[in-house]
Every structure is written in C-alpha cells, then in structure tokens.
C-alpha cells in the first residue's frame, strides 16, 4: 500500500459517497485498512447494551470508517480541497506535506 497523506487532526473534504461535499476533522486513521474516522461523517446507528458509560443502553449514533480514497485534504490557505505532495524540508532531513494547489506547507 502506498503512503497515506492524511493524518489525525487534519481537516478533510469528502469527495464521494453519501456525505459528498461535507468537511470534517480526522479522529483516527486505520492504516492497515486504508480508512479513516472523520468527525460527523458516515454516521451509523449502533445498538448498545447497558454499561457504566451508558446505563440505559439503546441506539447510539457514531462515526464509521470511510475509505481514504474518498477524502481530500483541505488547503489551509484557500479552504478548498487539494491533493497532497511531499518534499524535503529546509534542513534536508525530513519530509513535509504541502498542498499542491497553493504550495502551502501543511502542519
């Protein structure tokens, strides 16, 4: 599998599927599956038994994983979806991610 360009905490745009056009923050990246959990995206209803956290149990809405190919990173400069590139940093030791549309470095 190729390198994933999305990391936890990034703001992403959904480019296909039921939630197309929405944006959200990445909560978790599932590297082996090539999927990510995004805040408020791909919500599913899940039945839960009563427990200490939820004494009544019942139906709970929560995020389900969405495939990385359906996500684009949001450019920090323009606020629009963009592709991501990697280039050497100024010290020459590490790589940094950058937005292909604006050239802006992604923190």
UniProtKB/Swiss-Prot annotation:
Residues covered by region (Disordered): 73-92
Presence of the UniProt keyword Ribonucleoprotein in the record: yes
Keywords: Ribonucleoprotein, Ribosomal protein, RNA-binding, rRNA-binding
Subunit structure: Part of the 50S ribosomal subunit.
Name of this protein: Large ribosomal subunit protein uL24
HAMAP family found in the cross-reference section: Ribosomal_uL24_B
Pfam families named among the record's database cross-references: KOW, ribosomal_L24
PANTHER family attached to this UniProt entry: MITOCHONDRIAL RIBOSOMAL PROTEIN L24
Superkingdom, taxonomy of origin: Bacteria
Family from the record: Belongs to the universal ribosomal protein uL24 family.
Organism, scientific name: Phocaeicola vulgatus (strain ATCC 8482 / DSM 1447 / JCM 5826 / CCUG 4940 / NBRC 14291 / NCTC 11154) (Bacteroides vulgatus)
Matching InterPro entries: KOW, Rib_uL2_dom2, Ribosomal_uL24, Ribosomal_uL24_KOW, Translation_prot_SH3-like_sf
Function: One of two assembly initiator proteins, it binds directly to the 5'-end of the 23S rRNA, where it nucleates assembly of the 50S subunit. One of the proteins that surrounds the polypeptide exit tunnel on the outside of the subunit.
Gene Ontology BP annotations: translation
Gene Ontology CC, one term: ribosome
GO molecular function: rRNA binding; structural constituent of ribosome
């Amino acid at each position: 599998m190729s390198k994933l360009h999305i990391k936890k905490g990034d703001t992403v745009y959904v480019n296909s599927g039921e939630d197309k056009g929405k944006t959200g923050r990445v909560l978790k990246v599932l590297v082996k599956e090539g999927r990510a959990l995004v805040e408020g995206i791909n919500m599913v209803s899940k039945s839960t038994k009563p427990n200490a956290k939820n004494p009544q149990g019942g139906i709970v809405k929560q995020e389900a994983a969405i495939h990385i190919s359906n996500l684009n990173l949001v450019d920090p400069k323009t606020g629009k979806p963009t592709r991501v590139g990697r280039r050497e940093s100024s010290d020459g030791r590490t790589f940094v991610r950058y937005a292909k549309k604006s050239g802006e470095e992604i923190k």
